[in-house]
Curated annotation (Swiss-Prot):
This is DNA polymerase kappa. The gene is polk-1. Residues 570-584 have a biased composition (Basic residues). It comes from Caenorhabditis elegans. The keyword Transmembrane helix does not apply. Zn(2+) binds at C519, C522, H536, C540. GO terms for biological process: DNA replication; embryo development ending in birth or egg hatching; error-prone translesion synthesis; reproductive process; translesion synthesis. Keywords: DNA damage, DNA repair, DNA replication, DNA synthesis, DNA-directed DNA polymerase, Magnesium, Metal-binding, Mutator protein, Nucleotidyltransferase, Nucleus, Schiff base, Transferase, Zinc, Zinc-finger. It catalyses: DNA(n) + a 2'-deoxyribonucleoside 5'-triphosphate = DNA(n+1) + diphosphate. GO terms for molecular function: damaged DNA binding; DNA-directed DNA polymerase activity; zinc ion binding. The active site is at E181.
Amino acid sequence: MLTFNDNKAGMNGLDKEKITKVIEENTSASYSSFSKKQQSRIEEKVLEIKNRLQTATREERQKSEILMENLEMKLESSRDLSRDCVCIDMDAYFAAVEMRDNPALRTVPMAVGSSAMLSTSNYLARRFGVRAGMPGFISNKLCPSLTIVPGNYPKYTKVSRQFSQIFMEYDSDVGMMSLDEAFIDLTDYVASNTEKKTFKRHRFGGDCPCWLPRFDENENTLEDLKIEESICPKCEKSRKIYYDHVEFGTGREEAVREIRFRVEQLTGLTCSAGIASNFMLAKICSDLNKPNGQYVLENDKNAIMEFLKDLPIRKVGGIGRVCEAQLKAMDIQTVGDMNLKKNLYPLCFTPLSQESFLRTALGLPGRPSESDPRRKSISVERTFSPTSDFNILLEEHQEICRMLEEDVRKSGIVGGKTVTLKLKLSSFDVLTRSLTPSDVVKSLEDIQKFSLELLEKEKGKEIRLLGVRLSQLIFEEDEKKRSKTITEFWNEKKLQIQNLQGSENVDDDDVIMMDTRPCPICGTDVENRLDVMNCHVDECILKVQNDDGPELICVSVENKSTQKPERPSTKKRKLQEKRPKAKKMVTIDSFWKKSG
């Protein structure tokens, strides 16, 4: 049974049964078969959970209760109510960009994508049940007047970079979760921002529909409102620009209003926001007052628990159709239910799932990660009409590899250690095949070579989606920090020597003979070469013997001491530097680094 998911802004109050029926009637037999198999697996898991709860003994339930009580105490000790976390989510982003650039799309139901798949839809289309992730041909059945526009992802990326620069002014470590969503920690900004701010505002009106944001003709005229009239260079109709000023106060709510205002002024696009003590809650809140609104959840435990009490579990990020079915098997419908029935988790779920569900029930963020927070992989995939024609698959494969290599270059990534091929068959079953070559996969040729090797093993299969992924990534910044090779080390030393020789301001106390060791007989610094040192020692021994001096113990210089040579005094060093046979010189620090 296919079910329609209406847990998205702008889709409240829809007739789910009617929409589900239309989807089922227009779904291919292959996908229906796949969906039934998937549903069968879910039902097996649900039955397993119900049986486990029925057979759990009293002792098991008591043990489970104690376990969750201890875990709750541990998690509560980590609750942090001091942060001002914000989730900014652009409103119907891809669709909004297209409507901004084409005024004719603003008053009709429209979506971005193709007949195969939609990326997003505007709010008018959502009233018909049209949403992201839905095939375009089914969307046309739900909304015959739907206009589908091909995606222009370079344009969406460019606009995203524009408003992300605004976010960085408030939090230099802003987390861009996607092109249209950002996590901003306003804590430091709010603490330091103690004065009101005033910004100049512009809005557009007149016969010209080209420009956003629009001026509301019903708005009460403000005292400082100024109007500038001109002819639009796009449509050549009369255009009015209304100028005035907007003031923003202090505090996190005002800061978020300020951010949203600046984004709209810069791009003509609106965004919504959620404000809370952590990003998990902020993301939930960002969906509540869409479009073009914001929701604030007080930094108070009681307020948080009250907020979560009646919240449907599907509103929480990470809880999808499968997880929802498993929780409903325990009669859990809301996040409040998750808290009431937390003692059942150890009976049915793994320790990681137990902690994850309890964190959600308590309104706490996910487990902190000690691993590298940067992306773990980068991939490109495409959906197309099912085919087993290998020539067609090769064309798709080459284009996907080209796009992936381009994304790798733009993302500051050197390459990856593992190549993965993803295939979705005409039956909708998904296959993944991976390969880890001996060398890092960096170039387009490497990506094509290794992924093609995997693809050739799947010849004859009817495929509807093809993707290539690089994982175990190596970043450019890592390459810069890596240990230097011996060659690089000596090249750098040579450069230091050249720079030092060309300098006239070298302190005598800061230089010594380069690449020398003291003679074990006379203490003189001698070039650190075995033949030179042996020759010098022989000369010293002969000289001492000819001078009728005391008998000396010959020290073998072939077996180098593991200790650092005794450094001659500063006075002796200066004398040595004045000798005509003095060699090149480097700094003392560089010498000891090399000798140590």
